[in-house]
């Protein structure tokens, strides 16, 4: 099976990595689809995020990283995905994710959405939280892959560098 895992990944967190690693085992092929959303002001360009994800997932078999704009269902069709993968950190994520799943299903009734619970040790992580911690010089090496931590520290000129 081919799973499409869409998101902004700005930046990629260890929570995202956990989901990608587990999905690669479960589904075989995982397409990490980086959304280029012109209405948002990302910390990293789409190209930088793709580089970070490719570097962080290089050890995994069956993981492909692509960019997309527009509807997730169109990206899924373009890449022959069998399902859309979404992560849930808490019940508060579920309502929004369920609404997206229903919307996607209304656009393509052959495409399923599969929800995976985030591992407990990563359930507090969000890209926004990571950026905020990095912006104020806090330790982020336990929150993101090493390359992402280095990029964030360069971006925010943080005194903290990961080991």
Swiss-Prot record:
Pfam families, per database record: CTP_transf_like (PF01467)
Enzyme's top EC category: transferase
The reaction(s) this protein catalyses: (R)-4'-phosphopantetheine + ATP + H(+) = 3'-dephospho-CoA + diphosphate
Amino-acid positions noted as binding ATP in the UniProt annotation, renumbered to this chain: 8-9, 16, 87-89, 97, 122-128
Cofactor(s) the protein needs: Mg(2+)
EC assignment: 2.7.7.3
Location of the protein in the cell: Cytoplasm
Pathway participation: Cofactor biosynthesis; coenzyme A biosynthesis; CoA from (R)-pantothenate: step 4/5
Binding partners and assembly: Homohexamer.
Full protein name: Phosphopantetheine adenylyltransferase
Species whose genome carries this gene: Synechococcus sp. (strain CC9902)
Gene label: coaD
């Amino acid at each position: 099976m081919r799973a499409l895992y869409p998101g902004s990944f700005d930046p990629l967190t260890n929570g995202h990595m956990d989901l990608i690693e587990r999905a690669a085992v479960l589904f075989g092929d995982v397409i990490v689809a980086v959304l280029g959303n012109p209405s948002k002001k990302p910390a990293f360009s789409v190209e930088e995020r793709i580089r970070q994800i490719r570097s962080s997932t290089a050890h995994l078999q069956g993981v492909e990283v692509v960019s997309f704009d527009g509807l997730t269902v169109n990206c899924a069709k373009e890449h022959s995905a069998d399902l859309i993968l979404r992560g849930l950190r808490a019940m508060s994520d579920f309502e929004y994710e369920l609404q997206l799943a229903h919307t996607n299903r209304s656009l393509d009734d052959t495409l399923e959405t599969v929800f995976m619970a985030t591992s407990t040790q990563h359930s507090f992580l969000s890209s926004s939280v990571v950026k905020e911690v990095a912006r104020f010089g806090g330790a982020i090496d336990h929150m993101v892959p090493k390359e992402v931590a280095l990029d964030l520290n360069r971006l925010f000129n943080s005194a903290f560098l990961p080991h």
